[in-house]
Amino acid sequence: DKTYFKGGTSLSKAYGLIERFSEDLDLFVFTGDKGASKQAEKTLNKKLSKYIAELNSDIYKEDLSETGGNYRKLYFSYDNVFQGVGLKEHLEVEIKSCDLPDKKLMFYPADKRVIKPIVTSFLESIGQDELISTYGLESFETQCINPRKTICDKVSRLVKLSYNEDATALLAKHIRDVYDLSALYHNQEYNDYLHSEDFLDAMYRVTIEDGLNKNSRSHLSLADAPIFKDA
């Protein structure tokens, strides 16, 4: 109950809102105690990172991984069957813990969602249910960060990138965020959300959160961001 699935991959696997392949897995960890210290949150992050690395020790790329502070990125090798299609060379697992001085300002709405592997759906469609149990491919339930938060995170990231001198190159590397936001915009529920006061309030809270984090650029105006100049 202290680990949350988030990001674009959760939009696909947990909510069925987008259709794209991703080699990234984003997780958020929280002790559940808003009075806990930053160190306690970092310790939880470290424990989870170590567990994931040890569980997949045969493919873990320790030399590439970043394992310090409240943000950790673990890399894992995999056999890439398809060549030249823009796939990353490694699987990435990003784990973020809360480092806000005042956790009362946290904005991480979450839901319990069922995750079903693609191969599980395929095996069910061809009547091979016994293989699902044989290989441990059953669906499972996990906590996921609500898409409303994911939308705000993606907007915030694109805004910050657009202020850089090499904005075009940086934004090109995050074109998946543009795709995700476009898909959500064309979903009636989230289109309504994007035109609501709730969205403005959520963006404000995310900006406050950014302002309390290290290396923040939340002072940059959202409305005046270069990415919106021709909008």
What feature does the model see in each segment?
Residues 1-3, 13-19, 30-231:
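Structured mid-to-C-terminal alpha-helical surface segments
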